[in-house]
Amino acid sequence: MKILALETSAKAVSAAVVENGKVLCSGYQDTGLTHSRTLMPIVEHILKNADLTMADMDAIAVAAGPGSFTGIRIGVSAAKGLAFAVAKPAIGVSTLAAMARNVAFADGLVICAMDARRSQIYNAVFEAKDGHLTRLTEDRAIALADLAEEMKADPRPKTIVGDGARLCFDFLQNANVPCRLAPPHLVMQNAMSVALEAEVLAADGALTSAQELQPVYLRPAQAERLRQK
């Protein structure tokens, strides 16, 4: 099963194609340009270089959230459009579950962290053992202080991954919670991990139509919060 995956949840943008656990091609860009300018050229570039077309894909996956509101909207909209154009199913992947796959080899707890501002992070915690991941919490927005209290009670080794990893690491260290950062080349979210997580979901039947694919924000955008006041 060939899966094209898109990752636009933070500053960087990436795309990858995976087949049966093997990465066939991938592209990554972190140049400060908007995702609306860079995503589709990356998709076109990797497919062309791998001598693939959209018709060769069996499903389109995307990091559906949480993450940057604008980034998630762009990624989900692109995935919906691509899936609809070639009449293929879509797979919405948790940004946090995907990034946990970066360090599934690191036995212990995997703490996924994205900066959600206001002293909070988007977070999920997994247990990694022998390359397998077990989810311990739901995706959530949590105060760093509350996360520190949770982690103090758990003696297992802790690896932090995600674009908010440094923020989380510094806070936990100051709170006397032993932890470590994921290696630099694995700390950030990427489309390859989105594709690998999508394979697991597809095997469980978690396919959806382009029309049904929806972003997952966890909390309202700033503009919506202001309208509600």
Residue ranges of model-derived segments:
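N-terminal beta-alpha supersecondary unit
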Residues: 1-64, 188
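Surface "functional belts" at beta-alpha junctions
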Residues: 22, 34, 89-188, 217, ...
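Stable alpha-helical structural segments in soluble proteins, enriched in small hydrophobic residues
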Residues: 46-50, 85, 103, 191-202
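Phosphate-handling active-site elements
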Residues: 48-55, 84-93, 105, 206
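DPxDG-like acidic metal-binding loop motif
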Residues: 61-90, 95
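Glycine-rich phosphate-binding/hydrolytic loop that grips phosphoryl groups
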Residues: 184-215
